[in-house]
Design a protein with these regions (language model features):
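Loop/turn elements at helix/coil->beta-strand transitions in domains of secreted/extracellular proteins
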Residues: 1-3, 37-40, 88-91, 128, ...
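Active-site segment of extracytoplasmic enzymes that catalyze sulfate/phosphate-ester chemistry
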Residues: 5-6, 12-93, 104
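Generic enzyme active-site microenvironment
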Residues: 7, 95, 256
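Active-site-proximal cap/lid insertion segments
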Residues: 10-23, 135-142, 146-161, 168-280
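Short amphipathic alpha-helical segments and helix-helix/interface helices
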Residues: 29, 79-82, 120, 171, ...
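Short Gly/Pro-enriched turn/cap motifs at secondary-structure boundaries
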Residues: 34, 45, 121, 133-135, ...
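Acidic, His- and aromatic-enriched active-site or binding-groove loops in soluble protein domains
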Residues: 110-135
Length: 280
């Protein structure tokens, strides 16, 4: 039996078809939700990525897990879910965004420097197989390295498509009980980046949440960003759907996001706020 844990970035819980968002197209997640338990009141352990990822992997919140600053690495001796499942006979694998290794705080957050950081084996959280990247927010043409790729190698295409395809191939090759994390950067900014052929809708056609101030610059900015945001959600939903269709039907699937995005709700943007759109 296998366990698949899909982790996305900045995908708020409200932005799904099954959650009654009128703007979004998520047929694969909608189908999964019908067959699943939906934890409607679950919130992130922290509304910023590294802190949430460290807590999700270790079960220990910040600062107790020693990830105190945005650029703090997960300590090499931190015990994660991978260690526990290794001990119980599972073969553990991680694909995608790590965001818990040492990186240059002065480098551009969006770009190749963080994307090409090599995560040393002792800093991969105990996963027996690893193929991913530190950060960089390269939603297209990601750089991957790990167990089979000693140096960062660029793959052409949409990040979610590439990671889901490579995770699927690994899963299909496994005969042992397995645990696989697929960690995707989408739908994190930059929202204007290509969304695997999904064309953004016209911003003016979008229905904003009731708590977004009406006729204002905030509403205009929210519409512009949401057009790209929803395109990336649709593209990521499609990649996830292909992955789920490829793997054994008895797989236990967990889907979550490390945090959401305000998108103009209460006049605010991005994450880090103690509001529903940011924490759930």
């Amino acid at each position: 039996m296998g366990i698949l844990w899909i982790v996305t970035t900045q995908w708020r819980a409200q932005a799904c078809g099954y959650a009654d968002d009128p703007n979004v197209h998520t047929p694969n997640l909608d189908k999964l939700a019908i067959e699943s338990v939906d934890f409607t009141q679950a919130v992130t352990p922290h509304p910023f990525g590294p802190f949430a990822r460290a807590a999700l992997l270790t079960g220990v919140p910040s600062p107790e897990n020693k990830v105190v600053d945005y650029f703090d690495p997960l300590p090499d001796d931190a015990r994660t879910i991978a260690h526990d499942l290794n001990d119980h006979g599972y073969f553990t694998a991680f694909f995608g965004k790590w965001h818990l290794s040492k990186r240059n705080p002065d480098a551009e957050l969006v770009g190749e420097e963080h994307a090409k950081v090599i995560i040393p084996p002792q800093n991969r959280g105990g996963f027996l197989f690893f193929e991913g990247f530190e950060s960089g927010f390269l939603i297209n043409d990601p750089w991957l390295h790990g167990t089979r790729l000693e140096t960062p190698t660029q793959f052409k295409g949409y990040q979610a498509d590439i990671l889901c395809e490579r995770a699927s191939a690994w899963i299909k090759s496994e005969q042992r009980p397995w645990f696989c994390v697929v960690s995707l950067e989408a739908p994190h900014p930059p929202y204007a980046s290509n969304a695997s052929g999904i064309k953004p809708v016209e911003p003016e056609s979008l229905q904003l949440r009731a708590n977004v101030p009406g006729e204002s610059k905030i509403a205009s900015k929210a519409r512009t960003e949401l057009a790209g945001y929803y395109a990336h959600i649709e593209a990521t939903d499609r990649a996830i759907g292909k992955l789920i269709a490829d793997i054994p039907t008895d797989t236990v699937i967990v889907f979550t996001s490390v945090h959401g995005d305000m998108h103009g709700s209460h006049g605010l943007f991005r994450k880090g706020w103690p509001h529903e759109e940011s924490i759930r």
